[in-house]
């Protein structure tokens, strides 16, 4: 029996976020291209070296990127939109596609399946010449071989998933374009095989949610590829869920091995294997360590899994690997010594997960006695955290038990509430607002750092925050916005801020993961029962409201987003954790309302991303996600207006869920997705307050008034002007002041023009 250790992908960002810093230095012209490429190579090779030293046998090559692996694939295959044709160098084209430029909008960005990672959406255009423009995986494979002597495992995004994630073609064109991908993939794989690649990992995460017809279509493509590259050792890799529905067909694909997720798809994949077995002539790559969470594995459970598999499958060849790329986990926990011992011991970041793979390999090849000490340690760690007082609070349990049906609904229906709110708030037609945050300048970040390091006092820091808040209240008044925000200068991150003020959360010092491009986030760790402690946003919001006669919105992050953007305890259902968060937020919302705040926004940008990949599992998730939002927001008076915000989602899947949230106003990203939600509203109705984002805040370019007016015009074709709001796509935290002010001025002018037109046509 042959058993190997493997990894599917390693975090890109560097132990001290060297990758992020290098990218941003290059973008701001602080380093030149040569220095950029040299530093990136050093980081890339260091990651390979770490995995080599940890004892991983099949080390992924090509998972490293300058921005996004889907964008890498798009560039490699020639999926380059014509609007970027004026750029000549690779990096200029690449980063223009990712970030846009002064004159060109970026390609769309959206969530990578149900994770908090974002990918750049490939664009197909008529007349596109699909070819292998650049065999990047080959270059990186040869680099690792020459520089480190590592015969790595090239990782590529599979043709079917790639094209399914792309946009710009009709369904009728899909099959034709898919066939056009065969030639470049054949060339790519042929060259890798000729260079000596022993195993080539082909990622097809979309296989977890395909129809039988689609699987057959994908199989034909793999048969066409295999015909031309008969000797390449292809490992077909799936993850994020099981392939149960199509397992019987997938195991007949002409590949040498198949990777399955036995963490997030354990039940389905095991059921399929028990029914259909597994081919003797293929390698089974077992995703047995959670690549999306930060907890130590249950080694006993993993070894039991292998015992079950060895009884049920015909193959003798296994690969021990994570459930997915470790892109979604921080790199190393060794710096987190500030954490309690019980929590620190329970954690496993990427490097620790690699060590777990080696432990499992040892147990499988040498017997469990070879890791008997480690097994005992793991059992003790799991017992300690499970029985901890922070996970067994009686007050939290009592609050959950006491919930009644009326806790999940507003007293009056939307139409009647909105009438009362219009009287109370006295807002104009097509009111303007922003999504919440304003620029976190170098001064803001530096002052916060000084405060956290004890260089300045609490009083000095609070004075600084008040000064920034007042400055931006005045800016908003001058610009002419209708509903203002305090700017969130006191907040580092929209989830971390609340987690720091709620019981049950803990925070890492260096637990960074990539969200999109160079943007990294440090998710909170929900390790215990969540409960309210003290007011979290009252002071700053009430201060901002005291500065102006205009309405100021309270700003909170919703329970489902806090859940989905955190590393969550895995000993109770996610629904229960979400309800705990909702109850804590409910208390905060009641305090805001009693302090005179009449508009309260509860953001849920991550509602869609938490949905299971399989449609059959959607209803159960949506039910408790919506109930969580309602639990947080339903205790306010009818006159209090509840807003919510969403971005980067496939909204057509959740229109009914959005409606069920019963928010008085929802603001939704529209501009970067090129108006897709506007198209969705052409086929359905939305009868509540809605703001469709009129400009993309993730690009540095300042859009013209006319661009925004066009989106307003398109939106009003499908939205009732009585309920329509005008706002940017998202918060403005990452933008510069000189970008924000003119953009908002253009937005307000577009709103005024639209109001004038509506009055003229009335």
Curated annotation (Swiss-Prot):
Q: Classify the source by domain of life.
A: Bacteria
Q: Give GO terms for biological process.
A: methionine biosynthetic process; methylation
**Sequence positions that bind L-methionine:** 435-437, 488, 603
Cite the binding residues for 5-methyltetrahydropteroyltri-L-glutamate.
17-20, 111, 519-520, 565, 609
| A Pfam short name | Meth_synt_1
Query: InterPro entries in the record, alphabetically?
Result: Cbl-indep_Met_Synth_N, Cobalamin-indep_Met_synthase, Met_Synth_C/arc, UROD/MetE-like_sf
Q: In which pathway does it act?
A: Amino-acid biosynthesis; L-methionine biosynthesis via de novo pathway; L-methionine from L-homocysteine (MetE route): step 1/1
Residues annotated to bind Zn(2+)? 645, 647, 669, 730
User: What Gene3D superfamilies does the record tag this protein with?
Assistant: 3.20.20.210
Q: Does the keyword Transport apply?
A: no
Residues in the active site?
698 (proton donor)
Member of which family?
Belongs to the vitamin-B12 independent methionine synthase family.
PANTHER family, alphabetized:
5-METHYLTETRAHYDROPTEROYLTRIGLUTAMATE--HOMOCYSTEINE METHYLTRANSFERASE (PTHR30519)
Q: What does this protein do?
A: Catalyzes the transfer of a methyl group from 5-methyltetrahydrofolate to homocysteine resulting in methionine formation.
Record-given protein name: 5-methyltetrahydropteroyltriglutamate--homocysteine methyltransferase
Source organism: Bacillus cereus (strain G9842)
The gene it comes from is metE
């Amino acid at each position: 029996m042959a058993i190997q250790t493997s990894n599917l992908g390693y975090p890109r960002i560097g132990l001290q976020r060297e990758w992020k810093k290098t990218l941003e230095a290059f973008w701001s012209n602080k380093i030149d291209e040569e220095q950029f490429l040299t530093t990136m190579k050093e980081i890339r090779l260091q990651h390979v070296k770490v995995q080599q030293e940890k004892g991983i046998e099949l080390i992924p090559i090509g998972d490293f990127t300058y921005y996004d692996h889907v964008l890498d694939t798009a560039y490699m295959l020639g999926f380059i939109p014509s609007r970027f044709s004026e750029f000549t160098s690779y990096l200029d084209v690449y980063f223009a596609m990712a970030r846009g430029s002064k004159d060109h909008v970026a390609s769309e960005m959206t969530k990578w399946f149900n994770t908090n990672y974002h990918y750049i959406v490939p664009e197909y255009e008529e007349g596109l010449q699909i070819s292998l423009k650049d065999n990047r995986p080959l270059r990186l494979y040869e680099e690792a071989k020459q520089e480190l002597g590592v015969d790595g495992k090239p990782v590529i995004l599979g043709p079917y998933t790639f094209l399914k994630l792309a946009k710009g073609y009709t369904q009728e064109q899909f099959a034709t374009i898919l066939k056009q991908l065969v030639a470049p993939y054949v060339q790519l794989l042929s060259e890798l095989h000729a260079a000596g690649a022993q195993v080539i990992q082909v990622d097809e995460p979309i296989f977890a949610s395909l129809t039988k017809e689609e699987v057959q279509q994908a199989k034909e493509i793999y048969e066409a590829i295999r015909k031309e590259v008969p000797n390449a050792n292809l490992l077909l890799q799936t993850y994020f869920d099981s392939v149960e529905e199509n397992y019987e067909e997938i195991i007949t694909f002409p590949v040498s091995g198949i990777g399955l997720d036995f963490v997030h798809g354990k039940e389905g994949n095991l059921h399929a294997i028990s029914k259909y077995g597994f081919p003797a002539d293929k390698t089974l790559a077992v995703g047995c360590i959670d690549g999306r969470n930060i907890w130590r594995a249950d080694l006993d459970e993993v070894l039991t899994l292998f015992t079950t598999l060895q009884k049920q499958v015909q193959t003798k060849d296994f690969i021990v690997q994570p459930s997915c790329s470790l892109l979604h986990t921080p790199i190393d926990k060794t710096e987190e010594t500030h954490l309690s011992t019980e929590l620190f011991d329970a954690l496993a970041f990427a490097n620790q997960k690699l060590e777990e793979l080696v432990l499992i390999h040892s147990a499988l090849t040498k017997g469990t006695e070879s890791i008997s000490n480690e097994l005992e340690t793991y059992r003790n760690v799991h017992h300690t955290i499970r029985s901890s007082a922070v996970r067994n609070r009686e007050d939290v349990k009592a609050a959950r038990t006491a919930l009644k049906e009326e806790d999940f609904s507003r007293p009056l229906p939307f139409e009647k509430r909105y009438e009362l709110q219009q009287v109370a708030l006295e807002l104009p037609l097509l009111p303007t607002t922003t999504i919440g945050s304003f620029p976190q300048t170098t001064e803001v970040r530096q002052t916060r750092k000084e405060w956290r390091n004890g260089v300045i006092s609490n009083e000095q820091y609070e004075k600084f925050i008040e000064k920034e808040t007042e400055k931006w209240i005045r800016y908003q008044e001058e610009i002419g916005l209708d509903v203002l925000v305090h700017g969130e200068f006191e907040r580092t991150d929209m989830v971390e801020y609340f987690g720091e003020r709620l019981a049950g959360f803990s925070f890492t010092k260096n637990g960074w993961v990539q969200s999109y491009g160079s943007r990294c986030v440090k998710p909170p760790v929900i390790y215990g029962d969540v409960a309210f402690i003290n007011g979290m946003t009252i002071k700053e919001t009430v201060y901002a409201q005291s500065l102006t006669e205009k309405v100021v919105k309270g700003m909170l992050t919703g329970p489902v987003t806090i859940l989905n953007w955190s590393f969550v305890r895995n000993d109770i259902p996610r629904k229960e954790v979400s309800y705990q968060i909702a109850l804590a937020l409910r208390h905060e919302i009641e305090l805001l309302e009693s302090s005179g705040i009449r508009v309260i926004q509860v953001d849920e940008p991550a509602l869609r991303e938490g949905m299971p990949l399989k449609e059959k599992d959607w209803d159960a998730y949506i039910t408790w996600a919506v109930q969580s939002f309602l639990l947080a927001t339903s205790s306010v008076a009818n006159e209090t207006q509840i807003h919510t915000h969403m971005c980067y989602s496939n909204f057509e899947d959740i229109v009914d869920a959005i409606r069920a949230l019963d928010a008085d106003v929802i603001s939704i990203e529209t501009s970067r997705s090129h108006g897709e939600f506007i198209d969705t509203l052409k086929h359905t109705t939305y009868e509540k307050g809605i703001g469709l984002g009129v400009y993309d805040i993730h690009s540095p370019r300042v859009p013209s008034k006319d661009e925004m007016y066009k989106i307003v015009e398109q939106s009003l074709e499908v939205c009732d002007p009585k309920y329509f709001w005008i706002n940017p796509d998202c918060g403005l935290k990452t933008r510069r002041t000189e970008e924000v002010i003119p953009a908002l001025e253009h937005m307000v002018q577009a709103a005024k023009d639209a109001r004038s037109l509506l009055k003229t046509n009335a």
